[in-house]
Regions:
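Walker A/P-loop nucleotide-binding motif
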Residues: 117-137
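N-terminal pre-Walker A segment at the start of P-loop NTPase domains
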Residues: 90-114, 279-282
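Conserved adenine-nucleotide phosphate-binding loops and their immediately adjacent elements
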Residues: 78-91
Length: 282
């Protein structure tokens, strides 16, 4: 007799099966266990359970349901931009071959990453605004924390510079404000590094500036002439980026414009439909 195939478990509509959600509090996202974890048959929503280690001792470990307090703390500590709290690699839509290659490389980085190992390659995503670079960075940090318990941190370059200046004004030593950046397993900097370089820890980067020789794409900051990445950061730092990173071009249409046009098209269609069904005046 053929055994019946067990019915697939329904995926939670709130968390999509991840077991956690992000709640926005002021200007940051706080990870919290989803209500669906209360029904976990292993930990009953506690997030921790006892398991035997390789020596036969009972140890307290995090449950895979999503309610593990340590994992929630790691996710909160990512400091992801609030607009990108729900962005995942699985939800990244690649509209061009370059975006597809970048997505595959981002996924491979997560799959192959070994916590604590030194000498792992860094990544630098190069692309015009709106092509999904921050989405990739956020999705990678999120998966690394959720799947592998990796300590990560997202920093926006110019805000980081502001924090550094503030630290100096308050009399902090360079070691005091650099230590949090040195300690994390993976650091993501949006918009361009020697403290990470010397520690042998990988860094995820994104920039709007093109590599030298890139055709059909240029970028210039307000009031400045167009520059490529080497001109922007200088030959020394550009050379170090080549040594540290695999450089990936994330080329494609500006997704902010694409989504804006799609919203306008939907609104126009809705208006036309409403006018077509409106009763005629007598």
């Amino acid at each position: 007799m053929v055994e019946p195939v067990p019915a697939a478990k329904p995926v939670c509509a709130l968390c999509g099966g991840e077991g956690f959600t992000f709640q926005q509090r002021e200007d940051k996202g706080v990870a919290a266990a989803c209500s669906c974890t209360v029904h976990c048959p292993s930990c009953h929503g506690q997030g921790r359970l006892y398991a035997r280690d390789e020596r036969g001792y009972e140890v307290l470990r995090g449950c895979g349901c999503g309610a593990d307090p340590r994992r929630l703390s790691l996710l909160t500590g990512l400091r992801l931009p609030t607009k990108f709290l729900a962005r995942t690699l699985g939800g990244y839509r690649a509209y061009s071959p370059a975006q597809q290659r970048s997505l595959l490389r981002a996924s491979r980085f997560v799959d192959e990453f070994v916590p604590g190992a030194s000498g792992q390659r860094a990544l630098l995503f190069c692309g015009p605004p709106g092509t999904g670079k921050t989405h990739l960075l956020s999705g990678m940090l999120r998966e690394l924390a959720a799947r592998k318990g990796v300590r990560g941190r997202y920093e926006e370059f110019f805000l980081l510079l502001s924090d550094i200046r503030d630290g100096f004004s308050r009399g902090l030593s360079s070691r005091e404000w650099l230590e949090p950046l040195r300690q994390v397993d993976v650091l993501a900097i949006d918009e361009i590094l020697s403290v990470r370089y010397n520690a042998g820890r990988p860094t995820l980067l994104a920039t709007n500036y093109p590599r030298p020789g890139t055709v059909g794409w240029e970028f210039k900051a307000d009031g400045q002439s167009a520059e490529n990445l080497e001109q922007r950061v200088g030959p020394r730092i550009y050379s170090r980026l080549h040594e540290m990173c695999d450089l990936m071009d994330v080329l494609g249409d500006d997704q902010r414009e694409v989504q804006h046009d799609a919203r306008q098209a939907r609104d126009s269609a809705a208006d036309a439909s409403a006018r077509g069904t409106r009763p005629a005046r007598s």
